[in-house]
């Protein structure tokens, strides 16, 4: 048994006592034996002894006594075992010879390692794997198949699955096939197979980003909503919107007589008329005296040699029927005045109704503007003069009391 190791790191067992070896000296062993030959602790394994290739031995080598040969040769068991091992190590290329067979042989390793049973390996670079790469098929073998170089390959039982890559020539052919519209239907069916096939052919691309999924989700919900809205708006656009105040037909659309040249008509909506052209049409208001009359535009006329007309503070707007006419020497009311009074009493005139009636009156009144300019000697239309507060009217005379009563409401 070797002694304990010295403090200087040199072994206490002399290598010179190994006479059968004869190829190592003590000085040579001391020179080659250094402290860096001992590795640091690895886990829970303690490096307590060392046997070098050059024959240097130190540490606790008592466990080698059990393998020193026969049980009877106890005197040479440790050193003889080391000597034989060193001789075997020195011979290059000669495998070590088994000195003693173990009592119980170790069981053979399992064909499939439980640690790597579910692992996925990279393709093996051998001839069989290269042939499978060219074919481009994913095959699963029921039993482990041995390759040509002697290395056993892993099949389905080992849990190894190798996905082969296609050569560049086959990739270009697949791309041309994808661009062909005739194969588009086949490509969509192959993307989602209905049932698995025994040996399906898989096409592998360069990256995961090149995977194509052809999914048709149909028309979007937004397009459906827009279609329903367009259908609902179409009938609403065709239906006319009823007006708040439907226009009522005029009582007498056709005028009874053409207004003379000196007819004076006040039109509030027409701003281009001269200031002297004032329209004053009688309204069906009750008069306290036969010598006074009220007109729709707020002008009160007092009959006499010099009748004074003053506008009332409240204006009612243009309420002019299309059949109101009178001449210079006298007002001829007749049936037109009675019909207009009845129509006004029956309904209320709005501004839109007055504008419609005004549009029918304008062509008739337009012919009298020239004569009015000559009679009243007004300035040109470009000069806008203010409307006078009082107008002297001498041309209004009632025919008789009966006609005045017809105007009353």
From Swiss-Prot:
Pfam families: BORG_CEP, PBD. The keyword Cell division does not apply. The modification Phosphothreonine is found at residue 34. Residues 243-258 have a biased composition (Pro residues). Residues 167-189 have a biased composition (Basic and acidic residues). It is found in: Endomembrane system; Cytoplasm, Cytoskeleton. Residues 1-29, 167-203, 237-260, 282-329 are annotated as: Disordered. One of its GO terms (cellular component) is cytoplasm. Residues 38-52 form the CRIB domain. Sequence repeats lie at residues 235-241, 242-248, 255-261. The modification Omega-N-methylarginine is found at residue 53. The modification Phosphoserine is found at residues 19, 27, 39, 65, 77, 101, 113, 121, 139, 191, 205, 207, 210, 312, 332, 368, 371. Keywords: Cell shape, Cytoplasm, Cytoskeleton, Membrane, Methylation, Phosphoprotein, Repeat. GO terms for biological process: regulation of cell shape; Rho protein signal transduction. Probably involved in the organization of the actin cytoskeleton. Induced membrane extensions in fibroblasts. Belongs to the BORG/CEP family. This is Cdc42 effector protein 1. It comes from Mus musculus. The gene is Cdc42ep1.
